[in-house]
């Protein structure tokens, strides 16, 4: 009697495993593509530009040209993975109060021959209910 149940049990287990396979590939906390026009993505991008300028040793501000790609990950809050193009402006960093994002975006660009464009990858963590936002990773080239 045991032998007659084995052939049925094995295919049944295989069928169950195959049915559960799509669920196993949808891992909580995985990366999801986001629209570059999404308001949350825009907010994370603005923060990344401000932080880049605050941390950069460059004497001039860089402004956002465009968001190339955006992804997010659900963590405690949300983590945004952004690929962005930044351009060096004519606005010099001076001592005193640093410029905010909107002021930086209004800075003029140098003539085409003198323009310096960067492609940057930023990771921004946002937790709105704690009113926290942090730049967790940055690399530009």
UniProtKB/Swiss-Prot annotation:
Keywords: Disulfide bond, Protease inhibitor, Secreted, Signal, Thiol protease inhibitor. InterPro entries: Cystatin_dom (IPR000010), Cystatin_sf (IPR046350). Its main location: secreted. Residues 1-26 form the signal peptide. SUPFAM superfamilies: Cystatin/monellin. The record marks 29 as: Reactive site. GO terms for cellular component: extracellular exosome. Coiled coil: none annotated. It is found in: Secreted. It comes from the Eukaryota. Expressed at a low level by the venom gland (at protein level). A motif (Secondary area of contact) lies at residues 73-77. Belongs to the cystatin family. This is AsCystatin.
